[in-house]
Design a protein with these regions (language model features):
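Asparagine-centered strand-capping/turn motif at beta-strand->loop junctions
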Residues: 44-48, 163-169
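Short, solvent-exposed loop/turn segments enriched in Ser/Thr/Gly
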Residues: 35-41, 100-105, 159-161, 216
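Intrinsically disordered, low-complexity Pro/Gly/Ser/Thr-rich segments with frequent PxxP/GP/PP motifs
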Residues: 69-97, 184-211
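Surface-exposed binding patches on compact interaction domains or structured appendages
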Residues: 25, 43-91, 176, 182-183
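N-terminal signal peptide c-region/cleavage motif recognized by signal peptidases
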Residues: 17-19
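Beta-sheet-dominated interaction scaffolds and their linkers
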Residues: 22-45, 142-157
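Bacterial N-terminal signal peptides that target proteins for export
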Residues: 1-11
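Terminal connector regions
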Residues: 95-139, 209-238
Length: 238
């Protein structure tokens, strides 16, 4: 059994030593699509050492699951030579989305190597995924104000501590690192994007339940329109 295990491990090491190098770079970490724009776009570059095929598509977030995607994307399938770049163009059909708040979708870009360099080469189809935010002209406020205006509260439930966050804005808020600081200790918080006019509940890892230090704060980073993390520190009692 020990001998067999050694052969298996050796085989795995040999296989991964021959993985084909490939990689695409997107020209941004998100796409902002204002209603007044006829289209929006993003650059895709092949930084790998071989030519690849690129397949791209847009899919809905949870709020639009099961519904038609009101966007067109071109080119949906194309060849991209090593070191070259191309533009992906996104078009909104003009109907199907709320006119008073932001909507979010996902742009998927998948690279498919065209041919193997040898019989023992492992070919990988790697997918990148970024958010597409559609913003109607009728929206008020800004994404920056949305991020800074979040309301945080502590909630203990079933023997665990949570942070409840309320987003009263018309924008989505995406998070980077979030921490809960209480009684001189720091606890990580598992956060995810909060939709417009909604509330999220996030677990605080390792935090005790019961009494709440009135000096407790939440330190969080939101990801702005340019993909940069912006730091905020707020009290959970305000």
């Amino acid at each position: 059994m020990i001998v067999k295990s050694r052969y298996v491990l050796a085989g795995i090491a040999l296989l991964y030593s021959s993985v084909a190098a490939a990689g695409i770079t997107l020209g941004g970490t998100r796409i902002i699509y204002p209603q007044k724009s006829k289209e929006t776009s993003i650059l895709v570059k092949n930084d790998g050492n071989q030519d690849i095929m690129i397949q791209s598509w847009i899919e809905p977030d949870v709020a639009f699951k099961g519904k038609d995607v009101p966007f067109a994307l071109t080119p949906a399938l194309s060849r991209l030579a090593t070191g070259k770049q191309q533009t992906l163009r996104v078009f909104y059909y003009g109907q199907g989305l709320p006119g008073d708040k932001e909507s979010v979708f996902w742009l998927n870009v998948q690279e498919i190597p065209q041919k193997a360099e040898g019989d023992n080469t492992l070919q990988l189809a790697i997918r990148q995924r970024i958010k597409v935010f559609y913003r109607p002209d009728a929206m008020t406020g800004s994404s920056a104000e949305a991020a800074s205006g979040l309301k945080w509260r502590v909630q203990d439930e079933s023997g665990k501590r949570y942070l409840r966050v309320t987003n009263d804005s018309l924008y989505h808020v995406s998070f980077g690192t979030t921490q809960y600081k209480s009684d001189g200790k720091t606890y990580p918080v598992d956060t995810e994007m909060v939709s417009p006019l909604s509330t999220g509940k996030f677990p605080v890892k390792g935090a005790p339940v019961g009494s709440i230090d009135k000096r407790s704060v939440v330190e969080y980073y939101n990801i702005n329109d340019y993909g940069a993390p912006i730091k905020h520190t707020v009290s959970v009692f305000e």
